[in-house]
């Protein structure tokens, strides 16, 4: 055998190390790369017809954020279907998923590739991939030796998956790995703040507590809400979404609680509200800080007593609904200033979740960039979307005031720009494809010079200043047409008028022309 006793011992020790799964697998992959002499190695978890990287060595860091759907990666599909060691010949016409993703070899194609499917019983749970730039890199290792490696790694991976499920569900016994489960919403990130958030999601999801999710715009609060619902006993029942910021005051109560025929002009039939739709499930109220005080009082009653009244109906209806609420405001400050009910705040914030801003998430920007690159590749029918090292550095230097949403849009825009100037079905993203400054977020123009410096104001004042400037610019761009401005800002026009009035941008109701 090509493996020495000492080398096998190193592998066994790495698999049994008393450290976290992520660190254990990273060390294992590094050891395997050294023993096998390959240029790149990766451990992948299999779920929902795709491979998810758990640990890599010798590959670009953004690979950890990519999700390799079988339908778009024929080599990985071949590994998943093989049931045994797969050796791809150097002249294979199947594209390697890591072409262009090995630092220092971006312009070269991977030559030698070995795939080891990992099984728990008869169920595929992952794969180990080994890549080399030389065509004969793995010829000295027999299939028997590689099967031994696969068996050791598969056992460790299966144990890690079972332990993770135990920790998430906090129940015994667990269901077998191959049982059908509702698809969990994946939250990408390995930074300390995100690992803590994932742990808190697992804790609160198993309960039936109402949850308040706070965070800046674009951080992924809706994704967190989906993860809480999908990890809860209500996962098989509906998750109903309502954006409170997009609710005109005139229909907000009907949207929440429903109405009966004839309750108001235009009510031509009975209609269920969001609470009825979410019965036995979960209701996600996004931007809950935008609700009026009157509606807050009615929402509080539902949380207290579990009954609702349709508009125009004297009868009460019982509902069993878990409420998840999200806000980008500091609701404690809103309570102090009289814009949010203290009793409702306390009802919602028994177990609050805070979603960190992207600038606080260390290297997660690279993982997320890889994820969005792979999404773009699939959507645009490209063979590869590669993030050049200089581009990765540029992304890490930006402070991302728009958070994950801004990063997603930046990647999509960069792919479109790069594709327009590069031939073929492979796109390489370079720094020039990202159109923003490097050192800091773009500063406001001279017209906004009077905006208060963030260091000298609290969060509320800074947010108001930003909103005031954004609305002012949108109004100018739309010739002060309020309806067009509302569309540009993706707001309901009535909500835009209320917000503008609160910010001191208007003092009277809109005239006839402003609606138009």
Curated annotation (Swiss-Prot):
Which residue ranges does the Swiss-Prot or TrEMBL entry mark as DNA-binding?
482-501
Q: SMART domains, per this entry?
A: AAA, GAF
The residues covered by the Sigma-54 factor interaction domain are 187-416
A single GO BP = phosphorelay signal transduction system
Highest taxon in the source lineage? Bacteria
4-aspartylphosphate occurs at which residues?
57
Tell me which residues bind ATP.
215-222, 278-287
Keyword DNA-binding annotated: yes
The pathway this protein participates in, as annotated, is: Nitrogen metabolism; nitric oxide reduction
Q: What is this protein called?
A: Anaerobic nitric oxide reductase transcription regulator NorR
The gene it comes from is: norR
